[in-house]
Design a protein with these regions (language model features):
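N-terminal secretory targeting signals
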Residues: 1-75, 208-213
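Catalytic glycan-binding domains that act on GlcNAc-containing polysaccharides
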Residues: 46-213
Length: 213
């Protein structure tokens, strides 16, 4: 009888010990999980901060590169990058257009009345300005910031209009939308929108991008 009692007590103690071990294991696992999650959160946060810092430094490099390339004011170069981010377009395409149009000269004026960095004409500049809620002033087309805003807005509009077909957008920027249609109708290469203008802009854009990277 005593033997059975001792065995029962021993069995109970073994069971209690087993559950205590499980509980300790669960507690340890929970602590390990908490520590792991904490470390992961730190890594995630540090990674996010690193990405932000890296992105910021990259943008600063691009602004400085644009400043050296164009000789435009630093603030104007920063404005170009910010407007490209807002409009979700490649800044090197914009730089290619400005190079082709005015050779980065804010005071450039074409024989047909084109003005400023993007060589905008009134029939393009006026509706773009009015759509932006700006008062149209032809003399302000020589103002770098005003001209850049209109130029980048127009480029972004055309890229969206032609479903990201850069040659169509660039040829339309140069010739107008009707001019693009007429050009493509006369094209011998399957109604291609590739023009000397679009090819030159793309050449500049690719060169600038390659030199930057």
């Amino acid at each position: 009888m005593k033997r059975e009692k001792y065995l029962s007590i021993l069995l109970v103690m073994c069971i209690l010990s087993y559950f205590m071990m499980i509980n300790m294991s669960i507690t340890a696992d929970a602590e390990d999980l908490a520590n792991y999650q904490a470390k992961t959160e730190v890594l995630r946060r540090d990674g996010f901060i690193y990405d932000l810092l890296n992105s910021y430094l990259k943008e600063k490099e691009l602004i400085e590169y644009t400043h050296r390339l164009t000789n435009l004011d630093y603030d104007d170069c920063e404005f170009i990058l910010n407007e490209c981010k807002i409009n979700n377009i490649d800044p090197f395409i914009v730089l290619g257009v400005i190079k082709r149009e005015s050779d980065f000269n804010p005071n450039a004026q074409g024989a047909a009345g084109e003005r400023g960095l993007g060589q905008l004409m009134e029939n393009t500049a006026r509706p773009v300005a009015e759509n932006l809620g700006y008062v149209y002033d032809p003399d302000k087309l020589f103002d770098s910031r005003y001209n850049l805003k209109l130029t980048i807005t127009q480029i972004a509009y055309l890229i969206n209009l032609y479903d990201n077909d850069l040659h169509m957008a660039l040829t339309a920027y140069n010739r107008g939308q009707q001019g693009l249609i007429e050009y493509m109708e006369k094209s011998e290469n399957n109604s291609s929108a590739v023009s000397d203008y679009s090819a030159k802009v793309m050449q500049f854009a690719n060169e600038y991008k390659e030199n930057f990277h």
